[in-house]
Amino acid sequence: MSRVAKAPVVIPAGVEVKLNGQVISIKGKNGELTRTVHSAVEVKQEENTLTFAPREGAVDGWAQAGTTRALLNAMVIGVTEGFTKKLQLVGVGYRAAVKGNVVNLALGFSHPVDHELPAGITAECPTQTEIVLKGADKQVIGQVAADLRAYRRPEPYKGKGVRYADEVVRTKEAKKK
């Protein structure tokens, strides 16, 4: 049995939750997020909480209920507070700039790299070597950050590349003669 699924999700004031069969819509000050719940999970709304339980006869019911609870809790946090992800560019000549919904990266290639941001995600560059992504959907922010990092992953000898702000890059020792 999932311990995560047993804890209810508290709905704060100013957040509106709509249950429509297996589709849940959560609306707050940062926008609206919608998710389809797995068929093995039953979601009930009681006043200002959401509770989760497996449907009768579902083999993976508790596992899916725990996953659903974690995803919906992230949605509630996203529409109230939002999520941020910070990236750093390490390397000589590595720069980032934001123009509208496009992040422009200079990463040592012969051409600049332009990455278009999906709807609901904003980016800003406090310095030329930092990118801050903000948005309500935790999953989309993580995917955009991973896409930006994939253009030039940190290499293990000098540590140059795009890295998460809290990432520790283990460097290798150079070959000895």
Swiss-Prot record:
Gene Ontology CC annotations of this record: cytosolic large ribosomal subunit
Gene Ontology MF, one: rRNA binding
Record has Manganese as a keyword: no
Annotated organism of origin: Yersinia enterocolitica serotype O:8 / biotype 1B (strain NCTC 13174 / 8081)
Domain of life the protein comes from: Bacteria
Functional summary from the UniProt entry: This protein binds to the 23S rRNA, and is important in its secondary structure. It is located near the subunit interface in the base of the L7/L12 stalk, and near the tRNA binding site of the peptidyltransferase center.
An individual GO BP term: cytoplasmic translation
Similarity field: Belongs to the universal ribosomal protein uL6 family.
Protein's UniProt name: Large ribosomal subunit protein uL6
